Amino acid sequence: MARVSVVFSDVSIAFSQEEWESLDLEQRNLYKDVMMENYHNVASLGCFISKPDVISLLEQGKEPWKVVRQRKPCPDSETKDETNQVFSENGIYEMNLSQWKIMERIGNSGLKSLLLKNGWESRRKQERQEDPQEGYLSQVRHTSERVSSYEKRALTTRQRIHFVEKPYECNECGKAFRVRQQLTFHHRIHTGEKPYECKECGMAFRQTAHLTRHQRLHSGEKLYECKECGQAFIYGPELRAHQKLHTGEKPYTCRECGKAFRVRGQLTLHQRIHTGEKPYVCQECGKAFRQLAHLTRHQKLNVVDRLYECKECGKDFLCGSGLRVHHKLHTGEKPYECKDCGKAFRVRQQLTLHQRSHTGEKPYECTECGKTFSRGYHLILHHRIHTGEKPYECKECWKAFSRYSQLISHQSIHIGVKPYDCKDCGKAFRLLSQLTQHQSVHAGEKPYSCKECGKSFRLRQKLALHQSIHTGEKPFECKECRKAFRLNSSLIQHLRIHSGEKPYECKECKKAFRQHSHLTHHLKVHTVKV
């Protein structure tokens, strides 16, 4: 009996590099499953001799787009036209990269139609022959059933993705995944396993795809170029993220504070600020970090005592970028200048934040009271007023603070150190900011002016407090009687009415007062008597 020749290229699917990199992990795994299934099914027919390059690459964990797949000529000239006819619509073709068209292309490979046609042709020839080849027909039927079984599993996989079922759960942290391979990759975070090593620099990676991308750093290969500005990138996702700079698109928004990001990864990292999640733990000291890069820098610090040292003053830094910014202190370099007022900055981020003082932009809004802020960090600090959170505690007296800077300032009370002296009057201060504020007294400088009435102030905080007179805002409310105040200090004094607290006591007559000003006024009574 003459058999219809089947070659693996007829039932394989070719991807260009760009197409392959646009697939997500589930699609790549499904592709690998299909190719291996097709290979075993066709091999079971005994139709080709050597293992195809694409199968070798997949077995080695390499990316299959590197292989240029071409059709091999059918060895049976009599059946060549028949084979081509079978695959005329299911051969290799240019692909539309919509998500499910890719999946359909993978799932609907022409293997089943070929095998069913082969089975029908075989049965037709069997009827014309006196000696049927039952063994071959059984093999065709069995292989057909295997392909049908695969198609059912492919459908199940697609359905599982559609309904977002995540059956594979990590025993270490409970995180769940849709695909088993994702769980395998994730496990390596906990075990620290990095089986793929770069031969150039020795750097190791958890996934072979990460190694492939890394190797482009050594080759200098930049395949992705921006059509707007001509800038080239090593990775496709880098180009896509860069293009959003031109469009201004920020599709990923934080539900907690409303901040928007160009890249989903930036949103994921940002959300850990709200959740407090720190998944990366140093096995040496137990310290945890929100980002893997922060853990990596920390671990380098443990290995090398002084990683990045300033040659001018000897100060050490965790990373090279920190040293470069610091070095501008010595050179006086301030390359980022504000076009509105001419003020210059060492760091671009400082300029961005400064420009909001001109535009009045305050993108961060408190969901509790509606107050807006120009910086996300200020919103986080403000939110602690509503929650009452005070995460920074003094180990000397156990007093707690909502800000780390407040704790540092407080600790100098116990130490008694005042390292900052005023050259004009000799007065000493615990903090440099206190000295700076004090020096404006000698200079007579009042740089902060109210736009409503023109009154000037030495401190920005004083201006902010003054402006509440014009706005009528009273954000500090007493929970006992609902009375509201412009100043937090006024609320604190008012609360003593309800609590009966009188912390200021006269040493002469032991009389106590709620406010320090009342004590000062009272002391005059004793002075007059003397």
Swiss-Prot record:
UniProt cross-link Glycyl lysine isopeptide (Lys-Gly) (interchain with G-Cter in SUMO2), position: 125
InterPro entries documented for this protein: KRAB, KRAB_dom_sf, Znf_C2H2_sf, Znf_C2H2_type
Example of a GO MF term: DNA binding
Major localization listed first in the record, in broad terms: nucleus
GO terms under cellular component: nucleus
Subcellular location: Nucleus
Positions of the KRAB domain: 6-77
Pfam family name, one: KRAB
Listed SMART domains: KRAB, ZnF_C2H2
Gene3D superfamilies cross-referenced by the UniProt entry: 6.10.140.140, Classic Zinc Finger
Free-text function comment from the UniProt entry: May be involved in transcriptional regulation.
Family recorded in the similarity comment: Belongs to the krueppel C2H2-type zinc-finger protein family.
Protein name: Zinc finger protein 82
Lineage: Eukaryota, Metazoa, Chordata, Craniata, Vertebrata
